[in-house]
Regions:
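Active-site beta-alpha loop architecture of Rossmann-like, nucleotide-cofactor-dependent enzymes
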Residues: 2-4, 104
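Glycine-rich beta-to-alpha transition loops that act as phosphate-gripper elements at the mouths
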Residues: 1, 34, 123-125
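S-adenosylmethionine
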Residues: 20, 58-163
């Protein structure tokens, strides 16, 4: 099974941050779920009222599982795509970019994440937190909330100043 059952600390924290961020938003906002795995964040975004949702993963099995999860949950209009985030060239902006990835990859692809309003980043170990926060601040990304669970962190950041 592809990563992402909703029970892992990073996924659970990301879901909570996404729900809290968007609970009062009007329907139709957009989300890119990078490293979508089983598609849980993308599918939850649709349930929370997102309009345009894209899930990207490098693993073909993950994309198949994400599509199957969408069918099982009767959730439509989620664009799951196979892709290498290092080669990804986003078009337009997203209201939210969620990325549950290891910190080195998050830092590497950070310039591609900035055309958005909000970032939800997870998959980062506590011992890597300071480095990631420094890089975000250097890029004019404002950290709004950092969650900790066990050895993991997840964070919500506003990147509107970084554009």
């Amino acid at each position: 099974m592809a990563f992402g059952t909703g029970e892992h600390a990073t996924t659970a924290m990301s879901l909570r941050l996404l729900e809290r961020l968007t609970r009062k938003w009007k329907h139709g906002w957009s989300l890119a779920d990078l490293g979508t795995g089983s598609g849980i964040l993308a599918l939850a975004a649709k349930q929370f009222g997102a309009g345009r949702v894209t899930g990207i993963d490098i693993d073909p099995r993950a994309i198949s599982i994400a599509k199957a999860n969408a069918r099982l949950n009767k959730i439509e209009n989620v664009d799951f795509r196979l892709g290498d985030l290092r080669k990804w060239n986003p078009t337009g902006t997203r209201d939210v970019v969620a990325a549950n990835l290891y910190s080195e990859l998050l830092i590497e692809i950070l310039p591609k994440l900035k055309p958005c309003n909000w970032l939800i980043l997870s998959g980062v170990l506590r011992r890597q937190e300071d480095k990631l926060l420094r890089v975000l601040r250097r890029n004019n990304i404002d950290i709004v909330n950092v969650k900790h669970r066990g050895k993991w962190i997840a964070l919500l950041a506003n990147c509107s100043r970084a554009l």
